[in-house]
Amino acid sequence: MTKTKFNPYQFRKQFKWFKNNPQWVNFDNAATSIALDTVSQACKEYYELFSVNPHNKTPDLNNQIIAIIAETRQLVADWFNVTALEIIFTSSATESINLFAHGLKPWIKPGDEIVLKGDEHSANVLPWVALAKQTKARLVWVEKQANQSLEDTFKSLINPKTKVVAITATSNLFGNSIDFAQIADYLKQVNPKAFVAVDAVQTVQHKQIDIAKTQIDFLAFSTHKFYGPTGLGVAYIKKSLQPQLQPLKLGGDIFTQIDPDNTIHFKSTPLKFEAGTPNIMAIYALNKLLRFFKQKFNFAQMMAYGHQLKQQAYELLNSNPQIVLANHDQDVPIFSFKHRQLATIDLATFLNINKIMVRQGSICVGRYRNKDYFVRVSLMHYNTVKELQYLAKLLATDTKTIIKNVIK
């Protein structure tokens, strides 16, 4: 297959899921995207061809896996324009963020400030709340101002006491993105010793990120939201910071010696952050995934298609007088909304009855837990205009008919 103009129907042929579930429309991609056939085949291939542990360096098969893990680390590094030594494999983006927050603990002093938004995924809120409590740091909450950009609001709260700025690059609830590079530049001017942590979980599948062009210290994402396997997260940690950071998990082969006074000497990075047997199968599958995109599909064209899909989804949703969008500044195709007359659970149930998968609730955003619920539609590159039109048709159903279907 050669690279051509992106065609979603051609792309769908790379997923057996659509053959096995022809009646379903997947609009819950921000939770987990469908895995490429390349990925599922790689998982099977790993167990059939290898199924060995990289910590044994004698057998040839083990050494092949060691080489594949190193190669995958380099492929990820190339994708983000960083060095392989700055890429760490974890179990999830959640673990990655916890790893970095835990590692910063000795650097945070009472009175230091941690700047973050409260209406983001709890994975990029709870670790910082815990860090503040453990270190007696002060949490500074960012509230979007009507007459100010989100970037300027962040910058207005940064001062010499700021030690960490935790940024979610794209909201999993609202689909709007933030220029984290601009905030990082400003923070480093105000306090060069401060840290910028970026949650890019909802960004990497929609935008190309060149970390080398930024001053961020950390970035996290999960492969299962980018057509990849579950159980694998990736953390970028700036190489110059790694020697000072303590690992989150201890064990395995991450150390060189233990002194008589119980001081642990860790191996060189990134191995000291990867205690225990890694998810080798998922790393092997990630290798195949990145090679697939490099060889068979043009990611720039995919991003352009995603932008077009976002525009069409917005127009269809915004034109329905019964639908109230949570915001109107989406940068990626993620939309949260309410129905003027229906509870979100009823609307989501109606869509499920008609074979459309969506998410409903507070969607892992603690601020809205037990307070404010939404229906979320999140798209990927295999979604089509035809699917969006089907959604629009269902949302145009009169309220009485929807309720009648739900209570059957």
Swiss-Prot record:
It catalyses: (sulfur carrier)-H + L-cysteine = (sulfur carrier)-SH + L-alanine. The modification N6-(pyridoxal phosphate)lysine is found at K225. Its EC number is 2.8.1.7. InterPro entries: Aminotrans_V_dom, Aminotrans_V_PyrdxlP_BS, PyrdxlP-dep_Trfase, PyrdxlP-dep_Trfase_major, PyrdxlP-dep_Trfase_small. It holds the Pfam family Aminotran_5. Keywords: Pyridoxal phosphate, Transferase. Transmembrane segments: none annotated. It is an enzyme of class 2 (transferase). Its cofactor is pyridoxal 5'-phosphate. GO terms for molecular function: cysteine desulfurase activity. Belongs to the class-V pyridoxal-phosphate-dependent aminotransferase family. Csd subfamily. Catalyzes the removal of elemental sulfur and selenium atoms from L-cysteine, L-cystine, L-selenocysteine, and L-selenocystine to produce L-alanine. This is Probable cysteine desulfurase. It comes from Mycoplasma pneumoniae (strain ATCC 29342 / M129 / Subtype 1) (Mycoplasmoides pneumoniae).
